[in-house]
Amino acid sequence: MKSTNRSTVAISLFLLLSRSPSLFFSSLLPFSSSTMPTRFQKVLAHGTTMLDVVYTNESREVSFFLEQLKEKWLDAAMDHEKFLGLDLEYTADQRGVAVIQLCFTRHVLIFQWASSDKHFPELMDFLRSGITFATVDIRNDKLKMRYSFRIEIPTGCLIDIQTVFRLRHVRTSMAHMVVALIDEEYGDM
């Protein structure tokens, strides 16, 4: 790996997973009905990092994940590691939120918002709580969160990885960032 910063690697892996259907989503997306089962999976990322992934549309699983996140993982982390990866995926017409993804070190929540009952006060409170989130190109996600959830994440609580790692292009794609920051092998995906 080109970067040894564990937090950078975790966020980069999260972003890679969130944008690369060939890696992960194609194996999960067959469950699109409102009765889809919650799935807990271990996913090997980059050959050496095992991720614990929860894929669900159930409020109790989201609540449990957030509780674990706050009480076990986030509180135990060093201050410079207290941020989460955040990404939204959209419906085919780009008008609605389909999936909300959160990642912290090796823990990933993939919450299928589109097939849920859309009543998750714990999740909305968590997103508003002042935790720092890292993402790539937050512009569209901020708009969707504002209009879909009435959530405004303060500017000081957002890290846009594109502005942290100034690469060759002003708005470098996530794929180019992963190749430059993690490993050139990702260029073939």
Description of each model-found segment:
Residues 2, 17, 24-84, 88, ...:
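N-terminal accessory regions of nucleic-acid-interacting proteins
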Residues 9-10:
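Acidic, Ala/Val/Gly-enriched low-complexity intrinsically disordered segments
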Residues 37-55, 106-113, 117-121, 126, ...:
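Active-site-proximal helix-loop-helix substrate-binding element of RNase H-like nuclease domains
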Residues 79-80, 95-96, 127-130:
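Short, well-ordered loop/turn elements at secondary-structure boundaries
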Residues 86-87, 100, 134, 178:
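Structural signal for hydrophobic/aromatic residues that build the beta-strand cores
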